[in-house]
A protein has these predicted regions:
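Active-site-proximal or metal-binding-adjacent scaffold patches in catalytic folds
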Residues: 1-127, 136-173
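Walker B catalytic acidic pair
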Residues: 132
């Protein structure tokens, strides 16, 4: 039936990663072609994402570690930038491995951001940060919450749309 056809087409379009040369991987919203070379650590060179050839059997692990390191730098800086801009005080920022959410704000002002967010464009990372920081003041998704988000990021709906259209590309790990 039509529903099965749509699901089949979706998974053909976005197959699971097997970490072969030429495969596409996303970082900061850009697609890079996977390659292997005699390098010590992950390198971006033009449109190539190069992993150490000597560790090819550990490619998934190596790439996830690299994404974590990038997220610790990029995502944490974006959260801090928007916290300062919004006058939001948080207790800590942590990376999460949640399968179904991009972020959360705990009762004790702990901001949790999915490490996969670093695969998204910066404007999407910004939206995730603003969304979670807004929860420090508003613990729900009330009209006031969304007004707060929109005050900081008037085009936040574009980021939501990007996430809706591209989540599969960044959730293959």
């Amino acid at each position: 039936d039509e529903k099965q056809h749509i699901v089949k087409t979706f998974f053909e379009k976005y197959p699971d990663s097997v970490f072969e040369v030429g495969e596409s991987h996303m970082y900061l919203g850009n697609l890079y072609m996977l390659d292997y070379a005699d390098v010590e650590s992950v390198v971006i060179d033009g449109n190539r994402l190069i992993l150490p050839l000597k560790e090819k059997n550990e490619a998934k692990h190596i790439l996830i570690e690299w994404y974590h390191a990038q997220a610790t730098d990029v995502v944490f800086k974006r959260v801090q930038y928007y916290a300062d801009l919004m006058g939001a005080t948080y207790y800590s920022i942590n990376l999460s491995d949640a399968k179904a959410r991009w972020g959360s704000c705990g009762a004790k002002q702990t901001i949790n951001i999915n490490w996969r967010a670093v695969m998204c464009p910066l404007f999407v990372i910004d939206y995730i940060a603003i969304h979670e920081l807004s929860h420090i003041q508003y613990k729900n998704h009330s009209r006031e919450f969304w007004k707060r988000v929109e005050t900081i990021m008037p085009d936040y709906r574009e980021a939501q749309e990007w996430l809706n259209q591209n989540s599969r590309l960044v959730s293959i790990y």
